[in-house]
């Protein structure tokens, strides 16, 4: 999980450990249902046990890919928005990639735990904070969307504490951890009924 990549091979962000890139429809959060081109990078030092992309954790499994190739593929489809995700994409210098994509007039979205310093240019930041490696303060003021994964009741309080730190315009989402989603939804529904 906590594998480091060889930063010398990344050429200052002109190469990145690309897991996959593809055109799709967004399935979570504020932009659900909108088309986007996803760029998924390898490497994650957060290691959520319920992660649906554990295959991305070890960046050494993904040879550094020249960003010009990624930009070429992203601009060859109809996408107007690019989602950079992982793993944890902020492990890498994203300035060269985001600058190249912005040069084509594309909107750049970032999905991050916020636990590393920001690099790059983003039109939308989806912050998904994790208890085991909390976000840096700058992540809260950069966030346009806060998405907290809820696995148990205590996560609702964690979500509230994080929501208090983001800006007033930030969109707030609770995302049930899928293996316990029915239990979480029943818990939330029961609590809401008690408040009426």
What is each residue range found by the language model?
Residues 188-196:
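Single conserved hydrophobic/aromatic residue that forms the stacking wall/gate
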Residues 2, 25, 46-49:
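Basic, often amphipathic N-terminal segments
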Residues 5-8:
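Polytopic alpha-helical membrane-helix bundles and their juxtamembrane interface segments
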Residues 27-29:
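A short beta-strand-turn-helix
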Residues 80-108, 112-165, 170-183:
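Conserved glycine-rich "GG(E/T)P / GGGxP" loop and the immediately following alpha-helix
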Residues 31-33, 140:
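A generic structural micro-feature
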Residues 44, 89, 150, 192-193:
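Hydrophobic pocket-lining residues within nucleotide cofactor-binding pockets
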Residues 12, 16-20, 35-36, 42, ...:
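Conserved Radical SAM active-site core
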């Amino acid at each position: 999980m906590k594998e480091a990549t060889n930063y010398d091979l990344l050429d200052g962000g002109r190469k990145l450990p690309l897991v996959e890139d593809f055109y799709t429809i967004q399935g979570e959060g504020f932009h659900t249902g909108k088309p986007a081109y996803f760029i998924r990078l390898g490497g994650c030092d957060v290691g959520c046990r319920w992660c649906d992309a554990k295959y991305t954790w070890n960046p050494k499994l993904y040879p550094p890919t020249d960003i010009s190739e990624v930009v070429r593929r992203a601009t060859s489809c109809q996408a107007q928005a690019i989602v950079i995700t992982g793993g944890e994409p902020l492990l890498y210098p994203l300035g060269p990639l985001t600058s190249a994509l912005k040069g084509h007039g594309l909107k750049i979205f970032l999905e991050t735990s916020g636990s590393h310093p920001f690099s790059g240019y983003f039109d939308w930041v989806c912050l998904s904070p994790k208890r085991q490696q909390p976000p840096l303060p700058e992540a809260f003021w950069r966030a346009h969307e806060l998405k907290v994964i809820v696995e148990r009741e205590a996560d609702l309080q964690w979500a509230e504490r994080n929501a208090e730190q983001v800006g007033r315009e930030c969109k707030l989402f609770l995302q049930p951890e899928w293996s316990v989603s029915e239990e979480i939804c029943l818990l939330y529904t029961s609590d809401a009924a008690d408040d009426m």
